[in-house]
């Protein structure tokens, strides 16, 4: 899965969170949240560490953050964050401004996970952003090294256990293989039916030629 972690927070207060990998991602993200300026409420940011990029969307007094593989680009992760932002505000609105930590986690972590899988496996989902003309805005977001906001003593090495990611990739591979086998089986079944009909038709033509015509008059007497 290309997007492996997501969180919705108010300042440093985490309201909902989901991780598809094990490791210390949550600890690194909390350090990032601590370093974000509380005075800025609307912005897009990107910070890289190792082979991952932290994509950040700040809007409506909340922070929407996801971590994705650095080869996945920026458009789809930000499309994911826009979708999460829309769904979160629709479900909770201003309630989130006073909610305690993890108040929405039981319900919304499932949404984070479902949309994470959808956007990771459907790279074309950023089409809407292209129509909206947001591509140029996303391109203007510079990917900064995480050291830009982290002081030397604050930085935590990002440790990600890829086992979960590999298991997830294996699951998707098996799912795609099963779908492909089903499609090939259907294709072969259709071909077999067509071939059977063709053989029956040819046999009928041969029998008809020996029996005096289409109605087989010679063979009836």
UniProtKB/Swiss-Prot annotation:
A single GO BP: protein transport
Modified residues (N-acetylalanine): 2
Any one Gene Ontology cellular component term annotated for this protein: Golgi membrane
Entry keyword Acetylation: yes
Primary subcellular site in the record, as a coarse category: Golgi
Gene3D superfamilies: 1.20.5.110, Longin domain (3.30.450.50)
Domain v-SNARE coiled-coil homology: 127-187
Keywords: Acetylation, Coiled coil, Golgi apparatus, Membrane, Protein transport, Transmembrane, Transmembrane helix, Transport
Subcellular location: Golgi apparatus membrane
Pfam families: Longin (PF13774), Synaptobrevin (PF00957)
Annotated Longin domain residues: 7-112
Residue ranges, Cytoplasmic side: 2-190
Membrane topology: Single-pass type IV membrane protein
Keyword Protein transport: yes
Function: Involved in the targeting and/or fusion of transport vesicles to their target membrane.
Similarity-based family: Belongs to the synaptobrevin family.
Protein name as annotated: Vesicle-associated membrane protein 714
């Amino acid at each position: 899965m290309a997007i492996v972690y997501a969180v919705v927070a108010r300042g440093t207060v985490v309201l909902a969170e989901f991780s598809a990998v094990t490791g210390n991602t949550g600890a690194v993200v909390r350090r990032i949240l601590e370093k974000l300026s509380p005075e800025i409420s609307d912005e897009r940011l990107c910070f890289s560490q190792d082979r991952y990029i932290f994509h950040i969307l700040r809007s409506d007094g909340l922070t929407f953050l996801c971590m994705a593989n650095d080869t996945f680009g920026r458009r789809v992760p930000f499309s994911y964050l826009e979708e999460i932002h829309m769904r979160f505000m629709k479900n909770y609105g201003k309630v989130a401004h006073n909610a305690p930590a993890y108040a929405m986690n039981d319900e919304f972590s499932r949404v984070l996970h479902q949309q994470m899988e959808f956007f990771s496996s459907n790279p074309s989902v950023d089409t809407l952003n292209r129509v909206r003309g947001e591509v140029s805005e996303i391109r203007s977001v510079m990917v900064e090294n995480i050291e830009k906001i982290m002081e030397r003593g604050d930085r935590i090495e990002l440790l990600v256990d890829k086992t979960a990611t590999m298991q997830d990739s294996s699951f998707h591979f098996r799912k795609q293989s099963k779908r492909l086998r089903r499609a090939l089986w259907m294709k072969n079944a259709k071909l077999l039916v067509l071939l059977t009909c063709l053989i029956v038709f040819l046999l009928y033509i041969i029998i008809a030629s020996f029996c005096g015509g289409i109605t087989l008059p010679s063979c009836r007497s």
